[in-house]
A protein has these predicted regions:
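Active-site nucleotide/adenylate-binding loops and adjacent lid/helix of ATP-dependent enzymes
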Residues: 2-29, 66-67, 91-95, 103-189, ...
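Generic beta-strand structural signal
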Residues: 100, 130, 204-205
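Beta-strand scaffold of nucleotide-dependent catalytic cores
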Residues: 140, 162, 173-175, 198-216, ...
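A short glycine-rich, hydrophobically flanked beta-strand micro-motif that places a catalytic Asp/Glu
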Residues: 188-190, 200, 253-257
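Residue-level detector of anion-binding/catalytic polar loops
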Residues: 38, 97, 124, 147, ...
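A long amphipathic alpha-helix within ATP-dependent nucleotide-binding catalytic cores
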Residues: 221-257
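ATP-binding N-terminal substructure of ATP-dependent carboxylate-amine bond-forming enzymes
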Residues: 1-99, 104
Length: 257
């Protein structure tokens, strides 16, 4: 019987969470052995970085030297800081396959940069405005219009996303944000009314769609399942396959959703 391929899930539990592992991480750990993989969760903060020209076949994790894994799956989301990206880059330098690599992970963190890259390659994207305080609501109305979506540049599972129906609502929201975090990085985005409370989430590996679902909000405009929405299967076609493959190629991603 051949040995199981060894992999790491780079994951850092968020401080204060009662449930230390996310559902996605738990599921990966559960199903991996059935498919010939031996997975372990590694906190990137526990990895000691040593850069040299000779390479290595082992790294130090939590004070102990361990063999390099065959592959790494970063599952850090908005918690991906400089050190975590450096760990991913170092593992890539040592020949470990990372799904995704450091450049793709960094790009996935920055919503505005993603849109810049996609727009540069001709993909349709909603009008998006990077703002700093104070924000001119009249200018927002002229360039984007209302309602307008307000997003933090870093956020997942629907956090940091708000909908302002009019200028007064936008002013009230931005005044609150400025009072609590004057250095907040925000984008204002065109609201696509046809997608209010629903969207399609496609999961892909390589250039192939492996799963797709339509997400529907119970109330409000956020369709995230983690925000109380529901989900049902979505039947995708060749047009979806082509679009997904092109987006992943442009963004340099091996896995996306």
């Amino acid at each position: 019987m051949s040995a199981l391929a060894k992999g790491w899930i780079l994951y850092r539990p968020e401080p204060g969470l009662v449930k230390q592992e996310s559902y996605e991480v738990d599921r990966l750990l559960e199903v991996a052995p059935r498919h010939g993989y031996d997975l372990a969760v590694v906190d990137p903060d526990d990895v000691q970085l040593l850069v040299n020209a000779e390479g290595a076949d082992a790294v130090t994790v939590d004070g102990e030297e361990v063999p390099l894994p065959d592959f790494v799956i970063p599952r850090l989301g908005s918690m991906t800081g400089y050190f975590a990206l450096a760990v991913i880059r170092q593992l890539e330098h040592l020949g470990v396959f990372c799904l995704n690599g450091a450049d793709a992970v960094a790009l996935a963190q920055d919503k505005l940069h993603q849109l810049q890259v996609l727009a540069d390659h001709g993909f349709p994207v909603p009008k998006t405005l990077l703002v700093k305080f104070p924000v001119d609501a009249d200018m927002v109305e002229e360039t984007i219009g209302f309602p307008v979506v307000v997003k933090t540049l870093v956020g997942t599972q629907g956090s940091g996303v708000y909908l302002s129906e009019d200028k007064q609502g936008l002013d009230d929201l931005l005044q609150f944000v400025q009072a609590n975090n004057p250095d907040a990085r925000l984008v204002l985005q065109q609201f696509l009314s046809e997608s209010r409370g629903r969207d399609v989430r496609i999961l892909a590996v390589g250039t192939r769609i492996v799963s797709a679902m339509e997400r529907i909000a119970e109330s409000g405009f956020k369709s995230n399942y983690s925000q109380g929405g529901t989900a049902r299967p979505f039947a995708w076609g060749p047009k979806n396959e082509f679009s997904v493959a092109e987006v992943m190629r442009v963004l340099g991603m091996d896995m996306a959703g």
